[in-house]
Amino acid sequence: LIKNGEIKILRDSLHQTESVLEEQRRSHFLLEQEKTQALSDKEKEFSKKLQSLQSELQFKDAEMNELRTKLQTSERANKLAAPSVSHVSPRKNPSVVIKPEACSPQFGKTSFPTKESFSANMSLPHPCQTESGYKPLVGREDSKTHSLRGDSIKQEEAQKSFVDSWRQRSNTQGSILINLLLKQPLIPGSSLSLCHLLSSSSESPAGTPLQPPGFGSTLAGMSGLRTTGSQDGSFSLSALREAQNLAFTGLNLVARNECSRDGDPAEGGRRAFPLCQLPGAVHFLPLVQFFIGLHCQALQDLAAAKRSGAPGDSPTHSSRVSSGVETNPEDSVRILEGFSVTALSILQHLVCHSGAVVSLLLSRVGADSAAGEGNGSLVHRFSDGDMTSAPRGVADDQGQHPLLKMLLHLLAFSSAATGHLQASVLTQCLKVLVKLAENTSSDFLPRFQCVFQVLPKCLSPETPLPGMVLAVELLSLLADHDQLAPQLCSHSDCLLLLLYMYITSRPDRVASETQWLQLEQEVVWLLSKLGVQSPLPLVTGSNCQCNVEVVRALTVMLHRQWLTVRRAGGPPRTDQQRRTVRCLRDTVLLLHGLSQKDKLFIMHCVEVLHQYDQVMPGVSMLIRGLPDVTDCEEAALDDLCAAETDVDDPELECG
């Protein structure tokens, strides 16, 4: 009888654990479904706005073509009908009524045409003529000849306008990308844009709108260094001009090429809409790589100068003196940071809109064959010899694209530096990596293996909170692959442990409470994803110190979320409050899963006992009062509240 009772208890416990796991899976599925639905709604809204803008653009284009056609027709009419007009003047003959809509360009017209007028404009326009029934006998033969000529001319113009209209319609994505790239400024708070990168050189006079002070001397000094240090001069003025010419070519190609969706890594990925190829966007990469590489080289020079103790002893200083240009390494870094942030912003737009750029950055084949159009050699030339002092492991993979190497190199440098601009560099690097991982398929995610060697520096206490949120988003994307998920806790610097310590300590004193809640929600959803996908969840499946810290971190996050909901008062009304309640429920399920799998769960709760005792009754009352509370959540709350009483015994023994 006793054995049967034990078996029954074990069977009930097993069923309860399975039901909790099933609830976690269902909760994760619902969360992913909500995210997918929200993303789908945003995509639909964006698609509607895009169609509206496209329609307005077509109407405006048709209006411009109409004005251009009327202007050309009017000029030809004035030349051909000059003799007849001299005999019959409209002023002297009031019976001649000229249509101003058909014979004169309407320069004052600013409104868009209606759909009916737009459809009428797409048909063959009528020749410029007087009102029927009022044409005088004088010059009738000349008018017939002019009518035939005008009819053929306008037919050609209408056909050309029709072709231009279809070309514009098929290249909407290219137009969006060009508009984003030409935005001034590219980043709020910055004065730089793509125009500055296309117009910058050491030959431009300093102080001009497109030439910031000190950039010319910095570029000349770097050019002298690279010319003496390498045979090809990766940062020479000729290389900059070549990169700028390629970028101009890329602008033209993106504006003219049709949107192709064949063979890009994003196909079959997690996007609701396939990513356009836009192969012309690849031509921007040499210019982006030039300024990112220039910034990396300046950071290396500054590190060498600090190691030597005196800037005058550094090889950079001597090379710049020999080139006749004096530039302090710190000044060079400060000048180039703004250009680097602008280049990273351009790269982010390219990764968001061009499948060809995503394919090239993640390709393991030579850039010469992937880039095409003769720009692959330039891409390689910019990177050869520039990664000699990169952090260990960053530049080891020879199969990486050179620009991806530089991006990781710059990410490692900016993680260890301080300052507002360096924080912007770190944030922009992570934004590029997040978009790159988001726009690629699961088959290409193993190419992000190299990122794990740099991420420990990004999760340090010195990292600002926006950068930490982006790092967690990147980890959540990489955790979708079975090969990458175990590596979150497989290095000497455990990424999960660093993340837990950052959350419990809250080192960023400038960040707002809303930003901290966003980070905590991202972490909870990351742990929920890991707990559902892995047969031995990473949160409890190793002997790492993160097994202890995860209990503390989840308890602290649960306490903060509960305080936020309690301060709001009443049921959740806003989307932010509903997300907080959803995150609180997921945190409860995570804690319950830990209590079932971690034999030392009670001991691990001792350090946060006061918060655990305070939060569990309030959380239990809050969740049980929700209309959609589930049986698994009630069972989890029962177990956690029972564990609360068990925690008191070790506490008393310690006392």
Swiss-Prot record:
InterPro entries: ATRIP (IPR033349). Keywords: Coiled coil, DNA damage, DNA repair, Nucleus, Phosphoprotein. Phosphorylated by ATR. It is found in: Nucleus. Residues 6-82 form a coiled coil. The keyword Transport does not apply. One of its GO terms (molecular function) is K63-linked polyubiquitin modification-dependent protein binding. Heterodimer with ATR. The heterodimer binds the RPA complex and is then recruited to single-stranded DNA. Interacts with CEP164 (via N-terminus). Interacts with CINP. Interacts with ATR. PANTHER family: ATR-INTERACTING PROTEIN (PTHR28594:SF1). This is ATR-interacting protein. It comes from Macaca fascicularis (Crab-eating macaque). The lineage of its organism: Eukaryota, Metazoa, Chordata, Craniata, Vertebrata. The gene is ATRIP.
